[in-house]
Amino acid sequence: MGQDLTFKRHRRLRQTAAIRNMVRETKLHIDDLIYPIFVKEGEGVRQEVPSMPNVYQLSLDQLDAEVDEIVSLGIPAIILFGVPAEKDAVGSAAYHEHGIVQQAIRQVKESYPDLTVIADTCLCQFTDHGHCGVIEEGKILNDPSLDLLARTAVSQAKAGADIIAPSNMMDGFVAAIRAGLDSAGFTDVPVMSYAVKYASAFYGPFRDAAHSSPVFGDRKTYQMDPANRLEALREARSDVEEGADFLIVKPALSYLDIIREVKNETGLPVVAYNVSGEYSMIKAASLQGWIDEKSTVLEKLISMKRAGADLILTYFAKDVARWLNEEK
């Protein structure tokens, strides 16, 4: 080849693993991870979710062993989802003092006061119709639902939740919850809002885990259209104005562009929710031997951080923590 060619040799910075690590722009840390736990009423329950390998519904007597493992791995935070024994039209178990989530919060905080406990604040797991609000003649009522969400948030804060994470996508839900928390004296409890939550096909396995599928209709009148980008920014701005401290984008993998735009637009900490369908697809493919699970998971989570996520809520958190610890 002639000596008069001029071009940039980018491969110089890829010659060894050490050099590649030195110039790596995005890195994944255990401190980035939040692990979801499904707590279920009953005793001796450790029931694997059929569509989510290695994810379990746990009764309170099984919870300590799970949390012990999480803490030993260095994972800094969990988020709790409740699976109640009884449901009703207004989801009263969601805001009951002795609801399953409230009991789990108290139990975890008593044993591990330094572990950050996030409470998912919604009604769908607790209503007999499976929707995230009050129903009247087949319609989900926005404003009456806000009162119940605020009651739920306050009850969770009283139980000791460090962060409240409202997920139901009613208009004004952050304002209602922030006002409720402040009035009850919980001005220092932050709100991690599901600010941008799409009406996604990727939620199927979660509804299997949380027993939260709607009995009728769907959630498209309150969750977002997957085709919309500008609407996501309007939703995020509204939640910032109403007092949100963190913003969740859900799902994550199909919405990396939204994660970046929300981060640029708001400057608040952004949480990527690596949802159940994303988890189960990788699990299914890896069980068939079609992909390498570890490499695929790490690449996926790195893409979320590269897009702008500060934190990642993922069912892979324990696996990722083990892999990262092995690399130390």
Swiss-Prot record:
Task: Look up the record and name the pathway of this protein.
Answer: Porphyrin-containing compound metabolism; protoporphyrin-IX biosynthesis; coproporphyrinogen-III from 5-aminolevulinate: step 1/4
The prosthetic group or cofactor this protein requires is: Zn(2+)
Which residues does UniProt mark as catalytic?
A: K197 (schiff-base intermediate with substrate), K250 (schiff-base intermediate with substrate)
Q: What is its EC number?
A: 4.2.1.24
Under which main EC class is this enzyme filed? Answer: lyase
| PROSITE patterns per the UniProt record, alphabetical | D_ALA_DEHYDRATASE
Its UniProt entry gives the catalysed reaction(s) as: 2 5-aminolevulinate = porphobilinogen + 2 H2O + H(+)
Q: Which domain of life is it from?
A: Bacteria
Query: Which of this chain's residues are annotated to bind Mg(2+)?
Result: E235
**One Pfam family it belongs to:** ALAD
**What protein name applies here?**
Delta-aminolevulinic acid dehydratase
